[in-house]
């Protein structure tokens, strides 16, 4: 089966996720080219050794399945792009670094980007298109909504509920909540 993979967005967030995406595929023994999708392009170009093309060209690529990780820290943009991909029957792709730790009873929806040194402990539910940047963690019994972004170094302690579209800034410490 022919599969095509891409990161939607070739700016800072997308470029920082490309090495994670490459190691994610290598860990799964998948040999495939990964593209950047950049809607500002009229012609394809090279970015960090990967072909970058616009969405219309990507859609026209011949493949039985297409997978896209959305590389934008802006949650509203992620939601808009996720809706477009789903309408076009392109699957949201989740990636995680080799040293990401995911413990027991964790439910992470599609489209997640888990950067190096991220830890997700036990009994956690995470919504669609979650981004956890370098050195962030989510402790036990948390519920995280859709399109949430953790900037680098976020420390989310146990029993916390985070609503859709929240952006938690670098180095933030969210104190322990209480059980429901």
Regions found by a protein language model. Give the residues of each.
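Phosphate-bearing ligand-interacting subdomains
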Residues: 41-102
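Short alpha-helical
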Residues: 12-15, 76-77, 107
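Active-site catalytic pocket residues across diverse enzymes, especially alpha/beta-hydrolases
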Residues: 21-25, 85
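Glycine-rich adenosine-cofactor-binding loop
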Residues: 3-21
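Structural signal for interior beta-strand "rungs" in well-ordered beta-sheet cores
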Residues: 95-180
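Short hydrophobic segments within beta-strands
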Residues: 7-8, 37, 71, 169
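NAD(P)-binding Rossmann-fold cofactor-contacting core
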Residues: 24-45
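Short active-site oxyanion
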Residues: 4-6, 33, 65-69
């Amino acid at each position: 089966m022919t599969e095509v993979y891409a990161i939607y967005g070739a700016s800072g967030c997308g470029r920082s996720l490309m090495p994670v995406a490459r190691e994610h595929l290598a860990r799964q023994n998948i040999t495939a080219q990964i593209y950047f999708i950049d809607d500002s392009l009229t012609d394809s170009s090279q970015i960090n050794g990967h072909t970058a093309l616009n969405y219309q060209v990507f859609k026209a690529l011949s493949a039985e399945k297409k997978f896209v990780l959305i590389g934008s820290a802006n949650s509203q943009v992620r939601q808009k792009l996720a809706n477009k991909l789903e309408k076009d029957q392109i699957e949201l792709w989740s990636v995680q670094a080799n040293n990401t730790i995911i413990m027991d009873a964790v439910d992470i929806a599609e489209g997640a980007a888990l950067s190096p040194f991220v830890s997700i402990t036990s009994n956690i539910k995470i919504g669609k298109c979650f981004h956890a940047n370098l050195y962030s963690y989510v402790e036990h019994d948390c519920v995280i909504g859709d399109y949430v972004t953790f900037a680098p170094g976020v420390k989310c302690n146990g029993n916390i509920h985070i609503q859709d579209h929240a952006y938690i800034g670098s180095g933030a410490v969210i104190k322990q909540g209480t059980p429901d």
